[in-house]
């Protein structure tokens, strides 16, 4: 990348900062949830909506982001994304009730949904194809640093300032990023086909209705009849989309994607698998602070080994898959994640806190292997003309499953705690014990899906040899 013009390098820095803001926000909030609950006068059992509202909004808006960038221009959409994200951060910091905070997180999620995919599209347009991989490695590095800093930084701000600062720190970065985008970034546009608004609205309503209904009366305040209407409406919208997409070449996501068996298995496995693993970033800081009495900063520091393990293992994932095959790796990593989840709970409740960083490191390693393998399996056999659509659908499902996972974790805590959760008490230990047992079962279930993956590693071996010869 040394031969790139100076203005292109600045444009890559802008995209990198966008990636950093979005990645930091996905992890910095988790550590602050118990403090937010105390400040807002809410039960900690309701605070999962702060996470769900953001992640679900990202899932809903992702399919529209690429089309908007092509139609309106990458600079205009990237600028809008940063502005919405920054305004959402400001409104989050000013929120005095949970409902206000959830509404502000929705606005923040709209910006976050456009920031990363439009950033990828921007890189594709401003650098030569032979330098695309190097450029993407550069802009995604801050996105990897964000999850590493997020939990500890969130805990530090909460403990020594207030939870409002986890959102206020986005303001100077957002203002600088928005100004730099207008000044330096070109506004590339492309001829686009008509956007499938009907399909988009059906999928958006279906995802939102079913996720909200999952929270039940405890979070929504709706009557049983109202919840039933949400379930019926969400299910009907999903079925209507399937009917709408049948034989429709302009559909948001073509059903022909599912003619590829590995895509179908990988997508369904990703949905189920990320529901389980999506519980962990929410549950871990809540358990450490409410169940064990850790300070916010201490809880944030305890999350760092998980991120380090996730980053460190990535270098050998390809070799592991080439050696053992997708099926064995996915089944083994899924069952290992369930076991390490139980181990974390057991070690914590036994008071062996010195072992927790080791368990968290192993958890991050297992989770990373599983994520990377799931992603590759899902997309590897798709025809070139369907790769972009398949990748967009996978990205949407990843966000949706994480929102479902957080919702289910909140549901389990509420069910076992009878909607009451006192900090660092014997009752809290029992509540978390049964919650973690159920979580481990949910995490393990996708192994049944992955057991159906064809046991064929030849294609990966060819890819690995090409990579070695090119290096």
UniProtKB/Swiss-Prot annotation:
GO CC annotation: plasma membrane
Membrane spanning residue stretches: 12-32, 49-69, 77-97, 106-126, 138-158, 165-185, 197-217, 225-245, 263-285, 290-312, 342-362, 396-416, 431-451
Pfam families xref list: MFS_1 (PF07690)
Main location: membrane
Disulfide bonds: none
Keywords: Cell inner membrane, Cell membrane, Membrane, Transmembrane, Transmembrane helix, Transport
PROSITE patterns named in the record: MFS
GO MF, one annotated term: transmembrane transporter activity
Membrane topology per record: Multi-pass membrane protein
Gene3D superfamilies: MFS general substrate transporter like domains (1.20.1250.20), Multidrug resistance protein D (1.20.1720.10)
NCBIfam families hit by this protein: PRK10504.1
Protein family (similarity comment): Belongs to the major facilitator superfamily. TCR/Tet family.
Protein's name in the database: Putative multidrug resistance protein MdtD
Organism: Cronobacter sakazakii (strain ATCC BAA-894)
